[in-house]
Regions:
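Alpha-helical scaffold segments that flank or form the walls of functional sites
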Residues: 66-131, 151-160, 407-413
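His/Asp/Glu-enriched, well-ordered alpha-helical/loop segment
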Residues: 223-230, 272-357, 373-374
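Active-site gating loops and adjacent loop-to-helix segments of metal-dependent hydrolytic enzymes
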Residues: 64-96, 130-138, 203-230, 250-253, ...
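Active-site microenvironment of metallo-dependent hydrolases
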Residues: 1-19, 24, 34, 324-415
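Catalytic core of soluble alpha/beta enzymes
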Residues: 201-225, 230-231, 236-249, 262-272, ...
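Divalent metal-coordination and catalytic microenvironments
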Residues: 7, 21, 26, 46, ...
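Metal-coordinating catalytic core of metallo-dependent amide/deamination hydrolases
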Residues: 123-237
Length: 415
């Protein structure tokens, strides 16, 4: 059992408290006084213990494309640069390239990712081997996977390990035919399950859907029964008031990817409006080929900055709400209700924020500092499922050079 003491704790009510935290095995055992003796003591030294970040949308194995095909709009980037290279990917590539992404997540205080990609067997193996938490979903489209494979994956990976789970999904309306979309809707009905996909990422995507079906992606997919049990819409940039009414009615998660949307010039999601309307909000980085960083601090700041610019209102968004979206919101979007907060009985997915870094001083408002001036260098420790995987700038029990070598080897072949 580990005792965390002598520092701040971000409580489940998002308040800063000063209590001892005891972690036993993979879970938070006790908050406050404990009669049992700890095996080890972690002196927080005045720093902050808080729930980890959760990355609610990514494509981890796309590390191969970092700085390889930049400065292009989404559809040119996908069709000319990414899809041809993805056709060459094999399972071992997915394993090696995902491992690299997992390392980067840990340095940003991210303990779990929501990954849409291929070869879920190798993604699950990589995540489990490292001790990282991954929620997977299907990238089903007209060219790969099938309704049967999605159902098979759903049943296999929801009982694979404590670190792995699987959600129904498909790539996007513009890459997936009506028959396949109908098949996913039937699975959602069968399992009473939410569905996740890219939606309303670009203006061209929305215009294309209106041309095909006479309505926006959100309205079309809702009509098809995709959101009968909720789900998530990655990006949610070009959404209308009518779309947001569907989000509200169905409990759809708007998963914001500010870095990727800015870099690809896709647009700015109306986050301030979403917050005012009570829309469920989560945050993701998108993949390392389109962002190109896997950095939750950058995402939080970009959301804040772009909203204020877009709205021409310095008070349009509250940084504390954005911090909640990156932690509790993303966790709930991913179905990770058991590791969303610092509370007794929750899984110990925790991070320590170094308050002694220059960017965190002076201490006027710790939580605002995390969003406005925080960066990856304030992550002192990342714990996943009760295991410390990253601490003081070092990875614990992980052969990083092997991971770098294997990822480079895969990248060289795909280039």
């Amino acid at each position: 059992m580990i005792k965390f003491t002598n520092g701040y704790v971000l409580s489940k009510d998002f308040e800063l408290i000063k209590e001892d935290i005891y972690v036993k095995g993979d879970s938070i055992y006790k908050i406050g006084k404990c009669d049992e003796k700890a095996d080890s003591v972690y002196d927080l030294n005045g720093n902050l213990l808080m729930p980890s970040f959760k990355n609610a949308h990514t494509h981890s194995a796309m590390t191969f494309g970092r700085s390889l095909a930049d400065d292009l709009p989404l559809h040119s980037w996908l069709n000319d640069e990414i899809f041809p290279r993805e056709a060459k990917l094999n399972g071992q590539d997915i394993y090696d390239l995902s491992m690299l992404a997992f390392l980067e997540y840990l340095t940003s205080g991210i303990s779990a990712c929501f990954d849409m990609y291929y070869h879920p067997d190798m993604m699950a193996k990589a995540s489990t081997d490292l001790g990282f938490r991954t929620v997977m979903t299907s990238g089903l489209n007209n060219f790969c996977e099938s309704i049967q494979s999605v159902e098979d994956y759903y049943n296999i990976y929801n009982s694979y390990s404590d670190l792995i789970s699987y959600k129904l999904g498909f790539h996007a309306e513009y890459t997936t035919g009506k028959e396949l979309i109908s098949g996913i809707a039937k699975l959602a009905e069968k399992y009473e399950a939410p569905v996740f996909l890219h939606a309303s990422e670009t203006k061209a995507e929305v215009e294309g859907c209106i041309k095909r079906y006479g309505k926006s992606p959100t309205l079309f997919l809702d009509e098809m029964g995709i959101f009968n049990y909720g789900g998530g819409a990655y990006h949610s940039v070009w959404v209308t008031d009518e779309d947001l009414e569907v989000y509200k009615k169905r409990g759809i998660w708007a998963v914001i990817n500010a870095g990727s949307n800015a870099k690809l010039a896709s647009g700015i999601a109306p986050v301030s409006k979403m917050l005012k309307e009570g829309i469920n909000l989560a945050i993701g980085t998108d993949g390392p080929s389109s962002n190109n960083a896997l950095d939750m601090f950058r995402e939080m700041y970009l959301i804040e900055a772009t909203q204020k610019l877009n709205d021409k209102d310095a008070a349009s968004t509250d940084p504390i709400e954005i911090l909640k979206a990156a932690t509790i919101g993303s966790a709930h979007c991913m179905g990770l209700y058991d590791c969303d907060t610092v509370a007794e009985g929750k899984k110990a997915d925790l991070i320590v924020i170094d308050l002694h870094k220059p960017s965190m001083q002076p201490i006027n408002n710790i939580l605002k500092n995390i969003v406005y001036s925080g960066s990856k260098d304030i992550i002192k420790m990342t714990m996943v499922n009760g295991r410390v995987l990253y601490e003081n700038g070092e990875f614990k029990g992980i052969d990083t050079e092997k991971i770098y070598y294997n990822a480079q080897k895969a990248t060289d072949r795909l280039r």
